């Protein structure tokens, strides 16, 4: 099985190294095509107004001056060519990708691009807690990742579907199993704008989520992570809401 590994945190990210270890537990044919720099939050964007620059790091590792989606396209269509990947793994992201995160995430978008190209694709992310990004428990993803990916592949991924996996902020032995969960929703009132002024008196801003108690919905990816369970969420490319489609069709045909 040929595996293409990518991410949105960049070619030097520790999560990418973790995912390479996971991939090599599954196959000895692993290729890496990742962004040259951090592309967190770029979602499914493509570089249409700038050329893509490709740098070969080693025989099977490449860095791209572009987005995660650019990396998948270059990896599949140019680097691997006629011998394309059987599986695309994206991550392991530095921080969870749950709830509304999936609409912003370059990690998720890379898996989406793989799905568009007809390749089984899985996005993986490692949550972190009060300790912040500097204290991520990569061992959680590293130890549980291979068996979770194997089970997903054994179960099967239908066309047009990608799988979003999130590992909780805990040691591997503390994981309370796997939860197949729905995409959750956060309290967007917690999103804050931090206004500041630079040394020249010019204003600038940071976006951040304020820390507050929040009860995630039952059966959601947020709830699973809070309960120290690995969340597995199927996502689909078709964003059509069928009930609303039917309701609007009836309304406009009246």
Language model: regions and residue ranges:
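Short glycine-rich anion-binding loops that position phosphate/pyrophosphate groups of nucleotides
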Residues: 9, 38, 67-68, 93-96, ...
